[in-house]
């Protein structure tokens, strides 16, 4: 069928894609609103897309569908997964019940306003306007940094170990595989005499 309008066709809905709403991926064009994971419908971008033929996925769904089979495969360090492993017989303890407040001021207003969580890095109160959640804890935006190099993090770009958060690079260097050939990167020269 001839394309009289001259515009490219969206790889998902097959309608014309105009320049202002175009996202390109591996030679195909998409509407920004159509550039979603085929499985979970999350918005995608150049860093989160994985392509299989004509289909687009987020990296997590792509790994589950086309990656190596088995629990824990198809995801890198620091990837957040909602899979609790119940299909493998893994059981989780129930969360402890609500504990009474230790705040001596028991007014409802004081409990709502003063009962904020504490930042694991600086131990100060974290309020909603400055709260970032990562590794299951609330952090100040300014404290949400790699424990080793100080690089600012996002909830999708962190790895945690023993209650501390790291960028993926520092996590791999400090807690990744050890031994000959690891941690050198592509093109590293090894001199042996």
UniProtKB/Swiss-Prot annotation:
Annotated GO CC locations: cytoplasm; nucleus; Z disc
Chief localization: nucleus
Keyword Phosphoprotein (UniProt): yes
SUPFAM superfamilies assigned to the protein according to its UniProt record, in alphabetical order: Glucocorticoid receptor-like (DNA-binding domain)
Gene3D superfamilies assigned to the protein according to its UniProt record, in alphabetical order: Cysteine Rich Protein (2.10.110.10)
SMART domains to which the protein is assigned, alphabetical: LIM
Motif (Nuclear localization signal): 64-69
Modified-residue entries (N6-acetyllysine), positions: 84, 112, 131, 137, 161
Transmembrane segments: none
Keywords of this entry: Acetylation, LIM domain, Metal-binding, Nucleus, Phosphoprotein, Repeat, Zinc
Signal peptide residues on this chain, from the entry's feature table: none
Positions of modified residues (Phosphoserine): 81, 192
Subcellular compartments: Nucleus
GO molecular function: actinin binding; metal ion binding; structural constituent of muscle
InterPro entries: Znf_LIM
Chain ranges of the LIM zinc-binding domain: 10-61, 119-170
Subunit field text: Interacts with ASCC1; ASCC2 and TRIP4.
Functional note: Could play a role in neuronal development.
Protein name according to UniProt: Cysteine and glycine-rich protein 1
Organism: Bos taurus (Bovine)
């Amino acid at each position: 069928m001839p394309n009289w309008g001259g515009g490219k066709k969206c790889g998902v809905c097959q309608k014309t894609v105009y320049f202002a709403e175009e996202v390109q991926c591996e030679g195909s064009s998409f509407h920004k609103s159509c550039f979603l994971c085929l499985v979970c419908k999350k918005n995608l971008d150049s860093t989160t897309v994985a392509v299989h033929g004509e289909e687009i996925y987020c990296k997590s769904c792509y790994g589950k569908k086309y990656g190596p089979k088995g629990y824990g495969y198809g995801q890198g360090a620091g990837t957040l997964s909602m899979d609790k492993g119940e299909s493998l017989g893994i059981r989780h303890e129930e969360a402890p019940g609500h504990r009474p407040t230790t705040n001596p001021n028991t007014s409802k207003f004081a409990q709502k306003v003063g009962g904020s969580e504490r930042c694991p890095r600086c131990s100060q109160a974290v309020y909603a306007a400055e709260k970032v959640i990562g590794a299951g804890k609330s952090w100040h935006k300014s404290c949400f940094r790699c424990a080793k190099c100080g690089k600012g993090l996002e909830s999708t770009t962190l790895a945690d170990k023993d209650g501390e958060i790291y960028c993926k690079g520092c996590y791999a260097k400090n807690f990744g595989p050890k031994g000959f050939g690891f941690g050198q990167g592509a093109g590293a020269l090894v001199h042996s005499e």
